[in-house]
């Protein structure tokens, strides 16, 4: 009995590790896809949009810092590249939505909520209540739109898949 449970534990852990790597790989791929488009097009942006973004980001950092003193200029300098990248992505994202006539339907939203409920059946009521709030539903819609945009972009991308062994990743992490 205990051998079975050890084997099943090993399989479960291995499955979770593989899924985690897949998810991290997918996230990195999507980020690289967006970054490649930003680099290729290098859209112009209003400096005021970056300032507004940074102002909100600094406020968030202050809230997370629990009132500890914070050097606004250091935070600003640190996050400036992130702010510029995100403002550029936002501009491109809107153009892609218009150009590709991309949209998230009510059916898409309902299907995603159902998927979340099925994955967390014990929290069904909380999930449904959470997405009744317009701001939460909007966040879900934005996430789905991001997926639709990335799927749209994939048709134009030349992707080379490379399989990397875990031991190779460990070796690279130790180089730093």
For the regions a language model picked out, list residue spans one by one:
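Extended, charged alpha-helical "arm"/coiled-coil substrate-binding scaffolds
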Residues: 1-176
